[in-house]
């Protein structure tokens, strides 16, 4: 385990200030290659040095590569044993853990499976066939893209159908059945015990919004939440 002076070594004044501020929010704004991830991992190590249990720290990032790099850095800085106890990974990988724990409250089995893009396209094709819709008009990949956009804006099938502007836009594009395809696709996924990648984010939002028990349980586990590349989030 590094001591505080070793953790701060090689950092400039602003970076040291960010690493050593262990209470309250901290926002790091800098260009590519400026050492943002180094500051984030340094801050985690500094917090651990102050006595925080590693399982009280949640660290999130976007890509598997970035998550692997963060884990490697932490193993070097604090030792492999402590690094393994940190709740650290991509948004999707961490959220999957939480969703499995509370899946039944969302209508899914805890053993739900994850659709990749190919699986989702096949499911959309099945929906189009069931609805007797022309897949040359409703191109499966385009339909999936529209559904993905809705989910990334936290729009459920019910909310989409109730959104007059969205329905009007689809009708203007000569694709008035998008809302119904979305609803059928979502129903089929839930019935099969399946989530796609966008569902992981959407359902995590729904879980924390609507399930106070889950919100309390998850929020009380962590004293610190750190996010790398936060500018890539939707909000």
Where do the PLM segments sit?
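Walker A/P-loop NTP-binding motif
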Residues: 38-53, 69, 73-77
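Short acidic/histidine-centered micro-motifs embedded in hydrophobic/aromatic stretches
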Residues: 94, 143-146, 150, 203-204, ...
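Conserved helicase NTPase motor core
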Residues: 9-20, 24-28, 39, 58-59, ...
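Conserved P-loop NTPase-based nucleic-acid remodeling module centered on helicase motor cores
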Residues: 56-61, 65-145, 155-159
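Conserved adenine-nucleotide phosphate-binding loops and their immediately adjacent elements
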Residues: 1-7
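Basic/charged alpha-beta structural segments of nucleotide/phosphate-handling enzymes
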Residues: 125-194, 198, 212
